[in-house]
């Protein structure tokens, strides 16, 4: 299971991560998306799966020296930042409500967590231009 935003879903729904992931052989959890760690992820699965994954990682050059400080940042994020994910959801909802006021926004998909997806009715506004203008206002946004 790609758990990049698993904890966002847990906060939003009240369903725990174990329940979400019980039908998967493995779960990957990212510490740098919503949790605020600079880097880091963890892969969980059966002992056999993890042992195989470890060997593949080593073959592909995935070893890191002195990764303890990064692990400490991930632990801090787990201990202190999960409860803050609901704030991200509130900010996303606020952004969606503000976007609804703009004539140039045609459709906003339902906002459930921290992802806001919308279309522009004014096709003369390029996605890269919108991204730049929103970043100037302090928003981190990507276009696809």
Regions found by a protein language model. Name each.
Residues 1-143:
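Conserved PLP-enzyme active-site core in the AAT-like
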């Amino acid at each position: 299971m790609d758990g990049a935003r698993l904890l966002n879903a847990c906060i939003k729904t009240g369903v725990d991560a174990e329940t979400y992931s019980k039908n998967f052989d493995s779960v990957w959890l990212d510490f740098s998306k919503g949790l605020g760690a600079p880097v880091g992820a963890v892969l969980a699965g059966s002992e056999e799966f993890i042992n195989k994954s470890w060997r593949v990682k080593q073959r592909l050059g995935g070893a890191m020296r002195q990764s303890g400080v990064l692990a400490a940042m991930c632990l801090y994020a787990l201990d202190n930042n999960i409860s803050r994910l609901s704030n991200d959801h509130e900010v996303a909802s606020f952004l969606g409500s503000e976007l609804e006021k703009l004539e140039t926004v045609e459709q906003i998909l339902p906002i459930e967590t921290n992802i806001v997806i919308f279309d522009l009715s004014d096709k003369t506004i390029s996605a890269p231009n919108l991204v730049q203008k929103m970043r100037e206002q302090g928003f981190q946004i990507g276009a696809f």
